[in-house]
């Protein structure tokens, strides 16, 4: 059915109809699908920007084909209409069909045979979204007017129609704001880019020629009728594009197709914008035509021709105006989305968030720095509101075109760097101005909100930085810059080589807000150079980044979002590094080594001091011990040791004790002043005569002066001992001789009885006892030899103690008395020894007889009477013996230098050993401990106590 029509149509229209026939078909205006579409359009709340009605386009097409074929060829040359005349914004048919009351003419053709369509730029942007109308064969007839009213027919579900609606919604969603502006159904990326690709492939064929409508007035009428609606919808879209879409999602894939599509639009944008004024004037004329319907039919063909040109170009002009606005809104939304994503990433990394919060400048500082900004940077950024915020179309078209063209670089890299935190120029206004070179940077954190951060060192080529190194001549004379190239001194210089290859293809930059940054030759007006010079001043020291070894402390600003795009993908996870502040005073390697050496030396010195202190403490302790040991040695070696037999250690020693002063050696003292005290005791085996006996050791003091010639204290001790033994032996020999002669004489019972009566009252025992003297073997030998033995022989016979025997009754013991007063001055001291039985360690008085536990040996008569003469003789003998013993004791003490013996009650071992004698009935074996119990330090030897040179009771009780 299309063959007869094609034969009449021009070539351009034939191509147009053939292209249009490939779209979706529609059965007619009043078909169920068309009525459903028109009824469903009443529910739509989306703004409609349609200019042409498909039936009006159909009428124009038929009129051009049948009546003015030549005119249609003249009106549609390829060079007059730009090939980008069709909007990518796919919309449903115009809602004006709901209330149009004007008659609409259509050819009397069958609505089901031939399909042809003319797409309006406002209604469809793809080849698949055309409204098809089938030509009917027959005369022209007038269509009934559309029914006005709120009645609504139910929409029938058609899969193809629904698919077409989805495509239209997807196109509208992408064109409006790429974030579902004015649409409710989300669109997939595949459908979006497939539709846009088909659009640009088929647009040149469609836009080659546009026919003039059959009735000239009808096209102008319908154009003027919906011009106000287009303006209202355009303003509404502008207002919607100004609203920041924080909750929308921008498609992040296949941005190269978007870039290519946008580039095709930019080519003919200048020619389109030149007709903006003409299009607006035609709008006014169309509005006037709408007021008088009769004037529509009286229009001349020339006016119809001009109106047709207006109707042909007006959709493109309006679309370009809206497209620029939409692109600006889309870029603003993308920037806002990047800011939101950067905020989320900063929230996930608290450490970077703290750095950003610390680096935010104060408003007053920003205002002051804006006033001091360079004019070149103001020219560089142009109008921030035009580039980054939605405007009302009042800015120049050239600036808008330059901004849109520069934004293509941003689209290309958005898919690669979505995760890196950025800062945009939105919300900062004219904050992009840098301080002047002579200004003092009070707040170094002013650069923290620049569109470029510290990562610009990784993205810009090195030649830009080298060119900045030549700006040192601009800096002030007080700056401390030493090296011209700061790029080699920065810690991130190694990373700049990575991004250099990514910037190789950007040799020529289009006009953009940061275009001056890409020109290394603009040294004096380069904000990088200005900031570098200003940052190099001494006033910024201590506040800028970590200085290099040359003490240069330049604080570099941050790169823009475009510059961040060349960062490798593997570095996206980590937050953008920024120059850290100075952590403190910087030290060189030599100073650090000196410090470490000083610390090590201090530690060694402390260890040495601790060792020295420990050694000193040990030395003091050793000195104290040595002092104690020395005193002990002096006490042992320098003092007299009691005569104790090494063979028979159980020797009981009695030392004479005086109540008065010591008498000179050899002088006889008063018997009343002499007492005895026990020093030590032990078990003595003795000889056959006295297996258990007492030994009286006359302790002659050792004279130090006399022993100086020998040089050894031990020799002096031996000399004193020998002297005491000789004196005692002589005295005992005389006494033994006298007593032996007395006892050998026959005594009468009276004498013996008197003697016993004199002796018994002095003893607590009831059994009388007769004292007898049993000389030991060595004394008998000495006496038999006539005293011809030398003192050396007496030393060898030290194991043979002197034995003084007397007989006491069993169980009798003389208690200790504090004072040993002599009741009878005529009585002497009887120190007796008993051959058998336990030994009593009780001291005896001079006038007392010490009782023992055994009876007297044979040969002594206990019940014999003694005459008075015998008693007197015994008394005289005892007195002589006491005088001799006293002289011997004085001699011993004077030679040994011993002080006067203290009172025996103040301390004596007799009290300690008295209970043992009572319990066991035996003499306690001699030990070293028995020589002064409780004071081992003061009694280092047996028999004596204390190292003071005195007797045992002097030190133990004093």
From Swiss-Prot:
Coiled coil (UniProt feature): 718-743
Membrane-spanning segments: none
Comp. bias regions, Polar residues: 374-398, 470-491
Keywords of the record: Coiled coil
UniProt GO cellular component terms: centrosome
Stretch list, region Disordered: 116-160, 345-447, 470-492, 510-602, 916-958
GO biological process per UniProt: microtubule anchoring
Disulfide bonds: none
Feature: compositional bias, Low complexity: 116-132, 536-545
A GO molecular-function annotation: microtubule binding
InterPro entries, per the entry: CEP350/CC187
Family matches, as PANTHER family: CENTROSOME-ASSOCIATED PROTEIN 350 (PTHR13958), COILED-COIL DOMAIN-CONTAINING PROTEIN 187 (PTHR13958:SF5)
Protein name: Coiled-coil domain-containing protein 187
């Amino acid at each position: 059915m299309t063959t007869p029509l094609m034969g009449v149509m021009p070539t351009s229209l034939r191509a147009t109809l053939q292209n249009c026939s490939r779209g979706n078909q529609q059965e007619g205006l009043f078909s169920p699908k068309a009525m459903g579409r028109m009824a469903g359009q009443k529910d739509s709340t989306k703004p409609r920007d349609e200019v042409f009605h498909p039936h009006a386009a159909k009428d124009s097409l038929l009129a051009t084909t049948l009546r003015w074929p030549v005119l249609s060829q003249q009106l549609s040359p390829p060079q007059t209409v730009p090939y980008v005349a069709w909007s990518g914004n796919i919309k449903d048919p115009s809602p004006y069909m709901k209330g149009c009351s004007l008659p609409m003419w259509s050819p009397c053709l069958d609505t089901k045979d031939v399909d042809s369509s003319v797409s309006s730029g406002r209604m469809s942007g793809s080849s698949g979204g055309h409204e098809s109308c089938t030509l009917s064969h027959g005369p022209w007839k007038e269509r009934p007017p559309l029914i006005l009213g709120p009645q609504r027919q139910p929409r029938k579900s058609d899969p193809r129609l629904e698919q077409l609606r989805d495509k239209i919604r997807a196109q509208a969603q992408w064109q409006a704001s790429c974030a579902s502006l004015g649409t409710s159904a989300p669109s997939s990326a595949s459908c979006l880019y497939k539709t846009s690709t088909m659009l640009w492939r088929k647009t040149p064929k469609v836009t080659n020629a546009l026919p003039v409508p059959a009735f000239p007035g009808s096209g102008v009428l319908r154009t003027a009728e919906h011009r106000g609606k287009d303006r209202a919808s355009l303003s509404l879209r502008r207002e919607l594009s100004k609203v920041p879409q924080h909750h929308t999602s921008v498609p992040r894939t296949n941005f190269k197709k978007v870039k290519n599509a946008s580039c095709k639009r930019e080519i003919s944008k200048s020619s389109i914008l030149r007709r903006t004024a003409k299009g607006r004037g035609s709008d006014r004329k169309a509005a006037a035509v709408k007021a008088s319907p009769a004037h529509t039919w009286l229009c001349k063909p020339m006016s119809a021709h001009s109106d047709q040109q207006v109707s042909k170009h007006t959709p493109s002009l309006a679309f370009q105006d809206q497209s620029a606005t939409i692109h600006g809104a889309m870029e603003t939304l993308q920037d806002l989305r990047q800011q939101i994503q950067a905020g989320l990433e900063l929230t996930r990394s608290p450490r970077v968030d703290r750095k950003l919060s610390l680096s935010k400048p104060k408003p007053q500082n920003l205002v002051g720095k804006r006033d001091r900004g360079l004019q070149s940077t103001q020219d560089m950024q142009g109008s921030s509101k035009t580039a980054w915020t939605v405007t009302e179309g009042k800015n120049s078209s050239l600036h808008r075109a330059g901004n849109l063209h520069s934004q293509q670089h941003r689209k290309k890299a958005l898919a690669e760097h979505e995760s890196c935190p950025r800062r945009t120029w939105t919300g900062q206004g004219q904050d992009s101005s840098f301080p002047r070179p002579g200004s003092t940077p009070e707040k170094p954190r002013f650069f923290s909100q620049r569109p470029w951060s510290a990562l610009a060192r990784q993205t810009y080529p090195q030649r830009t930085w080298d060119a900045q190194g030549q700006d040192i001549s601009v800096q002030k004379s007080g700056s401390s810059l030493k090296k011209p190239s700061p790029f080699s001194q920065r810690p991130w210089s190694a990373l700049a080589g990575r991004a250099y290859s990514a910037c190789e293809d950007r040799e020529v930059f289009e006009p953009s807000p940061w275009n001056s940054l890409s020109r290394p030759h603009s040294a004096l007006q380069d904000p990088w150079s200005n900031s570098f010079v200003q940052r190099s001043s001494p006033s910024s020291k201590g506040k800028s980044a970590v200085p290099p070894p040359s003490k240069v402390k330049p604080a570099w600003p941050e790169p823009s979002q475009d510059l961040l795009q060349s960062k490798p993908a593997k570095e996206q996870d980590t937050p953008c590094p920024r120059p850290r502040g100075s952590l403190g005073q910087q030290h060189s390697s030599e100073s650090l080594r000196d410090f470490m050496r000083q610390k090590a030396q201090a530690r060694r010195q402390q260890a040495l001091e601790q060792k020295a202190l420990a050694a000193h403490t040990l030395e003091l302790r050793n000195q104290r011990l040595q002092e104690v040991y020395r005193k002990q040695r002096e006490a042992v070696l320098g003092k007299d040791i009691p005569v104790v037999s090494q063979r028979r250690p159980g020797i009981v020693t009695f030392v004479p004790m005086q109540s008065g002063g010591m008498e000179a050696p050899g002088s006889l003292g008063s018997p009343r002043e002499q007492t005895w005290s026990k020093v030590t005791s032990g078990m003595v085996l003795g000889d056959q005569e006295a297996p258990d006996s007492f030994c009286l050791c006359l302790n002659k003091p050792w004279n130090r002066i006399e022993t100086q010639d020998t040089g050894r204290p031990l020799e002096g001790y031996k000399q004193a001992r020998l002297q005491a033994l000789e004196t005692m032996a002589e005295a005992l020999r005389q006494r033994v001789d006298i007593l032996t002669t007395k006892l050998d004489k026959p005594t009468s019972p009276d004498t013996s009885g008197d003697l016993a009566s004199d002796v018994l009252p002095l003893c607590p025992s009831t059994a009388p006892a007769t004292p007898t003297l049993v000389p030991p073997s060595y004394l008998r030998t000495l006496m038999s030899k006539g005293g011809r033995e030398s003192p050396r022989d007496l030393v060898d016979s030290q194991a043979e103690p002197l034995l003084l025997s007397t007989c006491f009754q069993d169980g009798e013991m003389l208690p200790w008395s504090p004072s040993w007063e002599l009741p009878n001055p005529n009585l002497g001291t009887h120190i007796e020894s008993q051959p058998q039985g336990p030994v009593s360690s009780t001291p005896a008085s001079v006038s007392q007889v010490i009782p023992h536990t055994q009876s007297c040996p044979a040969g002594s008569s206990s019940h014999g009477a003694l005459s008075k003469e015998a008693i007197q003789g015994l008394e005289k003998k005892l007195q002589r013996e006491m005088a001799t013993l006293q002289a011997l004791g004085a001699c011993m003490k004077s030679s040994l230098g011993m002080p006067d013996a203290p009172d025996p009650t103040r301390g004596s071992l007799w009290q300690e050993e008295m209970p043992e004698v009572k319990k066991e009935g035996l003499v306690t074996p001699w030990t070293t401990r028995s020589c002064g119990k409780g004071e081992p330090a003061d009694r280092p030897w047996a028999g004596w106590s204390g190292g003071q040179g005195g007797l045992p009771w002097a030190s133990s009780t004093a």
